[in-house]
Regions:
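Noncatalytic luminal/extracellular "stalk/propeptide" segments of secretory-pathway proteins
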Residues: 32, 36, 41, 48, ...
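Bacterial signal peptide processing site
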Residues: 23-25
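Extracellular/luminal Protease-associated
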Residues: 60, 72, 129-224, 286, ...
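Soluble metallo-hydrolase cores and metallopeptidase-like ectodomains found primarily
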Residues: 135-158, 210-286, 296-308
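Metal-dependent peptidase/peptidase-like ectodomains
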Residues: 50, 147, 268-270, 322-442, ...
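Short helix-loop-beta-strand segments that form the rim/entrance of peptidase-like active sites
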Residues: 300-330, 338
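Acidic, Ser/Thr-rich low-complexity intrinsically disordered segments
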Residues: 488-567
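His/Asp/Glu-rich mid-to-C-terminal helical/loop segments that flank catalytic regions of hydrolases
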Residues: 449-501
């Protein structure tokens, strides 16, 4: 941040100084005790919906910038988010605090400026290029790649078929794994295509995946190719004629701090809530969409306190944006022992469907490790992002049981709106919170045919304001219920699936193992929810009733576990779990 210029005060200002010397009145302190208000009461101070149009504008701002931790576009993006939050009242007083946390004081930063890949021989042909930060093919230059001094003209060879020294190599495998080998061999240019075994399906022959290499000044220029470009180069090599390429790349490599933002609505003694979204990576959906919703949620509650007269919440609300994983690790560390639940927003704006597609986009909440990793019951299948498999109880028992994922599915719209949870896979900002013992869940959309490619740019088929609004509405309902109300909205959402799920679990084969595992898990998850709800569990009849429903389902599963264990196995099970 830049400092304001020093301005010489006028005599008038000097004369008024004694009148202004007193500090402004302090805001009231957060409540020392929990104030239980009925469901819906927060509507007096807060809108139900985020400003989705404004959120979409932020997606557009971020989309035009290739955001790598600490580089100039990243800093501009962080400045923009900070400006929006300050405009909503954060940083003005102790009720709404705003700070930057430094993750690394002197980190190397990297920014792509321009690149081009041309065929010189046998005939001149431009294959891929970009000359501005918001050009479509900006992902062709692998993150971390060095640039060139002017342009290089080099012979093209296939990996493993000729000496790579001083040449452009059409490489095998993934850049993260193979770049170092090619650098050691003296290649001048390393060309990598899409690898469907690792990156999944790419929807368009012109899509250029993005990736990264651990490069230094000594390594070859590293480029990603679309399938169309890779096919063209292979066809040229197949003719047997020499193929000469012209390659140019311009990058900005600097050193500087890597920072993140932490905005807090300061509240009372109950366990806090975190909304996290990573700011880095160049995509509109991944993850300008998550940052936009997180910022819009912070603005909604900030304005309600500053302008709407809302009291401090019963618990603190934290909104954090920064580099993926690293900013979540920092938050989990700094707030250790004060946070009850964390939500990661990562790829939340893509419209679901189309159902005619062989791999339609789904609206998903990823669960923490739990028995769904072995017995899904009525929980959805894996996302397809990472191959899942059975896990035993030793795997999921390390995670604190929590009903957070069920709460989010219900408040986001449930099955009626196409929302479902799926077993744990990992790979996003919920993982550091789980590692710190904080129940957390990932809200996201997948499969995504633009994922990690040049196609992930703002447009109605990639990021929809309606989708941003829906995610914002569900998250806001949870934050309002737990922050200002009796938690009944959250408790009812947690209980909603278990009336039927308990029966589904009891009917599974082998029923004893499933019922025992889910029964133990649900009982512990109910205890964890009771801790989150605090005084509302006894002060609010609606909250207490919903919690009793959950405990009733746990009891039914426990009974089924006992019957199946001491009975005759199959003959002793009752499919209804009654």
């Amino acid at each position: 941040m830049t400092s304001l210029p020093l301005v010489r005060p006028t005599l008038l200002v000097l004369a008024l100084l004694p009148l202004c010397a007193c500090p402004p009145p302090s805001p009231p302190p957060p409540p020392a005790e929990v104030v239980v208000r009925p469901a819906g009461e927060a509507g007096r101070w807060f809108a139900a919906d985020i400003d989705a149009g404004r959120a979409l504008e932020l997606v557009g701002f971020l989309d035009r910038r290739f955001r790598e931790p600490g580089n100039a576009p990243y800093r501009e993006s962080l400045d923009e988010v900070e400006s929006r939050l300050r405009g909503a009242g954060f940083g003005a007083d102790d009720r709404l605090t705003l700070e930057r946390w430094t993750l690394d004081e002197d980190a190397p930063t990297w920014e792509p400026l321009a690149a081009s890949l041309e065929v010189v021989s046998p005939e001149v042909e431009t294959l891929q290029s970009f000359s501005a930060a918001d050009d479509r093919e900006r992902t062709m230059l692998l993150i971390g790649s060095p640039g060139t001094a002017g342009s290089l003209e080099v012979d093209l060879v296939r990996d493993g078929e000729a000496d790579p020294k001083g040449r452009a190599v059409l490489a095998r495998g993934m850049p993260e794994a193979e770049y170092g080998r090619l650098a050691e061999a003296g290649a001048s240019v390393a060309l990598f295509g899409a690898d469907a075994r690792v990156e999944g399906r790419v929807s368009d022959d012109g899509a250029i995946p993005f990736g990264s290499v651990a490069a230094g000044d000594w390594g070859p220029v590293a480029l990603r190719l679309s399938r169309a470009t890779e096919r063209r180069l292979r066809d040229l090599l197949a003719t047997g004629k020499p193929v000469v390429l012209r390659v140019a790349a311009s990058v900005r490599v600097e050193r500087g701090p890597v920072e993140m933002l932490h905005a807090e609505v300061r509240g009372g003694p109950l366990p806090g809530l975190v909304v996290a979204a990573h700011l880095d990576e160049p995509g509109a959906e991944d993850n300008a969409s998550g940052v936009a919703v997180a910022a819009a949620l912070a603005e909604l509650f900030g304005r309600g306190i500053r302008d709407g007269g809302a009291p401090a919440p019963n618990r603190s609300l934290h909104f954090v944006v920064g580099p993926e994983i690293a900013h979540a690790e920092e938050t989990a560390s700094r707030l250790r022992g004060t946070v009850g639940w964390a939500i990661a927003l990562d790829q939340v704006g893509r419209p679901r469907g189309p159902q005619s597609s062989p791999h339609p986009t789904r609206a998903l909440v990823e669960r923490a490790p739990d028995p769904s990793q072995r017995w899904r019951a009525d929980i959805g299948p894996g996302s397809g992002w990472m191959a899942g498999g059975d896990a035993d109880e030793a795997t999921w028992s390390r995670a604190a049981p929590s009903l957070l994922a069920d709460v989010l599915v219900a408040l986001l719209g449930g099955a009626d709106r196409g929302w479902e949870s799926h077993p744990f896979e990992g790979g996003s900002d919920h993982v550091p919170f789980l590692a710190a013992g904080v129940p957390s869940a990932l809200v996201w959309k997948f499969p995504d045919p633009t994922y990690h490619t040049s196609l992930d740019r703002i447009g109605p088929s990639v990021v929809s304001s309606d989708e941003l609004a829906e995610v914002g509405r569900g998250c806001a309902a949870m934050l309002a219920s737990l922050g200002w109300e009796d938690g009944a909205t959250v408790a009812r959402a947690a209980a909603a699936p278990w009336e039927t799920r308990a029966g589904v679990v009891a009917a599974l084969t082998p029923g004893a193992a499933a019922a025992c595992a889910w029964g133990r898990w649900l009982e512990q998850a109910a205890d964890e929810l009771e801790t989150m709800l605090g005084a509302a569990c006894t002060a609010s009849p609606a909250t207490a009733a919903a919690l009793a429903e959950i405990l009733g389902a746990a009891t039914r599963l426990g009974d089924e576990c006992l019957r199946s264990t001491i009975g005759s196995g199959r003959g002793g099970r009752r499919g209804g779990g009654a």
